Amino acid sequence: MLSYVVRRLLEMIPVLLVVSLLVFAFIKLLPGDPARVYAGEDAPIEAIQAARVQLGLDKPLPQQYFHWLNGLAHGDMGITYRTRQPVTEVIAKSFMPTLWLALAGFAWSVVLGLLVGVVSALKRGKWQDWTLMSLAIGGISVPPFWLGLLLIQFVAMPFGIFSVSGFNQPSDIILPAFTLGASVAAVMARFTRSAFLEVAQEDYVRTAHSKGLRARLVTWKHIMRNALIPVITMLGLQFGFLLGGSIVVERVFSWPGLGWLLIESIQTQDQPVIQGLVMLFVLEFIVINLLVDLLYAVVNPAIRLR
């Protein structure tokens, strides 16, 4: 297990290097002058030129890249052009609201998605199955921003129970978490149902039934354990989506997270923050994929990581 983890961590290095090069190149292709953004729109030419020298933008692009990469390796992402604060501190401040939002949306969507998927599979072809899968299709089809606006219009504003802006108290997370997790719950329900029905048709399941084992024991010990393996992969991907793809939901609810920070940084052309956020999103997906692989062995000890 340890050797597998070490090998996977080493494999992350070339991936991150390639991604860092692509991110750097993409940022340099964006319109606008970073030195002017740093010095201010009304700054004189001399101040803009001084800012260009201070930020190292007068150096060749390869030298700029390796300087940024060296700082990145030491946890230094530079300073923001807008507030002159360290990018690491700005991202860290916005990371926790996004993490809490992702965890809340993930928790309820996984529980509901797994439950609905299993019930639908057990009631295959019956009215319960048709009803639950119809709701799941509806959940997948509804855009998150539209669902969020509906909740604000018909739940938050008429009753005044939930806040629709910011993160000031624990209850403020309810509507954004529901909005963020709705499509995930629907996807998980359909995926769990498919995985459950596929495993239920395997020979070892029929053998277990022929031996006279109780249906509940066969369901949870033989079917569910093996059906969870592909489901775990989907869980990892969906959690990565919740962490990196909450931009729209954060915008709708004015949630002070990474998505809101990314939009602000794009609008103000704050390139160091954009670079740092993209690298963070990529790192999140890589780490989540590693954790998913490790969970395989926990769910089914017959699987060996090599």
Label each residue range with its predicted role.
Residues L2-Y4, E89-Q128, P144, F167-R306:
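Alpha-helical transmembrane segments of integral membrane proteins
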Residues L17, L21, G138-F145, L235-G240:
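Hydrophobic alpha-helical membrane-insertion segments
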Residues L17-L21, L103-A107, L147-L151:
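Hydrophobic alpha-helical transmembrane segments of multi-pass integral membrane proteins
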Residues D58-L114:
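An internal, D/E-rich "acidic patch" concept
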